[in-house]
C-alpha cells in the first residue's frame, strides 16, 4: 500500500511507548495519514499499580498528553489480567510434584514461559480485531515485513525508515523513551527476571517499595527455586544477605 492509499483509511495504532511505535505515530501525523485511535495497553501489577517501570509510566502519561494536543484519541486499557493474579495462581498438575498446591509466584514470569506476555497479546487482539492497523516495523526489519497485509501496514516500511532513524524522529518531538538514555535495554515489567543489572540497581535505589513486592513474589513460591534465574543472578541479587532460594 502506498502512502496515498494509506490516507484513504483510518488507522488504529497499538502504541507501546517504544521508539518504533512512537515514530509510527509521528510519521502518520507529519504525513497526514488518519489515525482513528491510539491504543496503549497498561500492563498492571495489581488493580492500581502499573507493571511498567515508574519512569516509563510517567513518560507514557506525558506523551499521551502530546498526542491528545495533536487531536488524537488515545485509549488506555488495563491488561485483562494482572501480574498479581498470575502470582497467586496455584500449581495443580505440575511435573514437579513438590509445586502442586503452591503459588506460581515469580515462576509465572520465567524466561520463555512468561504468562504475562500472552496477557498483553490477548488484550491487544481483543481491541484491534478487524481494524486497519499501522504496525511499527522498520524498513530494515526484513524478517518481519512479510507479516504485513492490506489491513496491517507500516508507514516506516513505505517511507524507507530504518530502526536507527527512529531515534532522531522521536527526539525531534521530545518523545524518545527515557529508558534508552538510562541504559535500560528492555521496556518490560519492573519485576521481570530478564531485568539487567542496571535496571535492578535503579529499582533498588529509587523504588525500594517495589523491591519489597519482588521479595514477596519470590517468597510466596514456598518451594525450591534455586535453579531459577541463574543466567543473570536475578533472585540472588534481591537476596544478597538472605538465603531464601530454598524456602
Tell me what each language-model feature is.
Residues 1-173:
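ATP-dependent adenylation/nucleotidyltransferase module used to activate substrates
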